[in-house]
UniProtKB/Swiss-Prot annotation:
Keywords: Electron transport, Heme, Iron, Membrane, Metal-binding, Mitochondrion, Mitochondrion inner membrane, Respiratory chain, Transmembrane, Transmembrane helix, Transport, Ubiquinone. GO terms for molecular function: metal ion binding; ubiquinol-cytochrome-c reductase activity. GO terms for biological process: mitochondrial electron transport, ubiquinol to cytochrome c. It comes from Akodon lindberghi (Lindbergh's grass mouse). This is Cytochrome b. The lineage of its organism: Eukaryota, Metazoa, Chordata, Craniata, Vertebrata.
Length: 379
């Protein structure tokens, strides 16, 4: 078996990626989230496949087909709630994974980092089109509001929106194409994930100390396979608890009402994992400015390798930047809270302050703290 996995053309690739892969001996549980994201993707593809067998992408029957899945299909309710809450688990793991990358300076592996940003954007696009499919009130109005933002693009905006809608409003054509996108995008995510791994294994993994670990590496299996299995079991425990005991806690009550173009919900808002970006969008009174800020709130992650001037790797020995990092995390939580609140005082003011803080920390405070710490080292 050992000879086979080392010499077989296909097994050799698996062997170099998951069995004999030289891994730093000191990586902590924060490094588990990569494998958890892989697990989440598998769960989402499998549950999504079974849901697609019973779902109909037609405005007249989409809502009732979801109700049919929950009521008449064997364990349909479980598959549906695993898929819906699986998306939330996916984004929790995704945000922790990105947060760990920032904290431990993994962005210096620029190819891996940039593919990761593409993965984040693709996952967000997949989640957005997926949220439209149940064709509830928030699905319909969320799709209308978010796609309508493209009309802010000069010259081609209005044409682009009508092209995406497939008409003059969100309707049957929109739902059909969103279903097609939602079906194909997870497989594109899987392909990007393989490229992400390919780039990671070219350079080797980062580690908590931020030091070169070439002299102290251990095989991935059995040490980290067992460690990852523990993480997977804990993830499944949380996911099953959510799906079985609190299935609708992360959803929106408006989505229990079929889509009605004549009745606008009091507060249109996306799923919780988009609220931070939605808060940034709403903080700018100008439509085009808001759209640019929304896009930049994600794309600014690509600036981390460019703005990095520190002589140390990661934040473990950098108390000044560490403090700024935790302020940044707290600020993100404030933005998430504000995104779910109505557009009125004091929420708008808090949102504007938090949005300015978000960009200020990344563009100004972190590079300045890097310079301060570099000068402290020289003393």
């Amino acid at each position: 078996m050992k000879i086979l996995r080392k010499n077989h053309p296909l097994l050799k690739i698996v062997n170099h990626s998951f069995i004999d892969l030289p891994t730093p001996s000191n990586i902590s549980s924060w490094w588990n989230f990569g494998s958890l994201l892989g697990m989440c993707l598998v769960i989402q593809i499998l549950t999504g496949l079974f849901l697609a067998m019973h779902y109909t992408s037609d405005t007249a029957t989409a809502f009732s087909s979801v109700a049919h899945i929950c009521r008449d299909v064997n364990y349909g309710w479980l598959i549906r709630y695993l898929h819906a809450n699986g998306a939330s688990m996916f984004f929790i793991c995704l945000f922790i994974h990105v947060g760990r990358g920032i904290y431990y300076g993994s962005y210096v592996l620029s190819e891996t980092w940039n593919i990761g940003i593409i993965l984040l954007l693709t996952t967000m696009a997949t989640a957005f089109v997926g949220y439209v499919l149940p064709w509830g009130q928030m699905s319909f109005w969320g799709a209308t509001v978010i796609t309508n933002l493209l009309s802010a693009i000069p010259y081609i905006g209005s044409t682009l929106v009508e092209w995406i809608w497939g008409g003059f409003s969100v309707d049957k054509a929109t739902l059909t194409r969103f279903f097609a996108f939602h079906f194909i995008l997870p497989f594109i995510i899987a392909a990007f994930a393989l490229v992400h791994l390919l780039f990671l294994h070219e350079t080797g993994s980062n580690n908590p100390s931020g030091l070169n670990s070439d002299s102290d590496k251990i095989p991935f299996h059995p040490y980290y396979t067992i460690k990852d299995l523990l993480g997977i079991f804990l993830l499944l425990l949380v996911l099953m608890t959510l799906a079985l005991f609190f299935p609708d806690v992360l959803g929106d009550p408006d989505n229990f009402t079929p889509a009605n173009p004549l009745n606008t919900p009091a507060h249109i808002k996306p799923e919780w994992y988009f609220l931070f970006a939605y808060a940034i969008l709403r903080s700018i009174p100008n439509k085009l400015g808001g759209v640019l800020a929304l896009v930049l709130s994600i794309l600014i992650l690509a600036a981390f390798p460019l703005l990095n001037t520190s002589k140390q790797h990661g934040l473990i020995f950098r108390p000044v930047t560490q403090t700024i990092y935790w302020i940044f995390i707290a600020n993100l939580l404030v933005l998430t809270w504000i995104g779910g609140q109505p557009v009125e005082y004091p929420f708008t003011t808090i949102g504007q302050i938090a949005s300015i803080t978000y960009f200020t920390i990344i563009i100004i405070l972190i590079p300045v703290s890097n310079t301060i710490e570099n000068n402290i080292i020289k003393l």
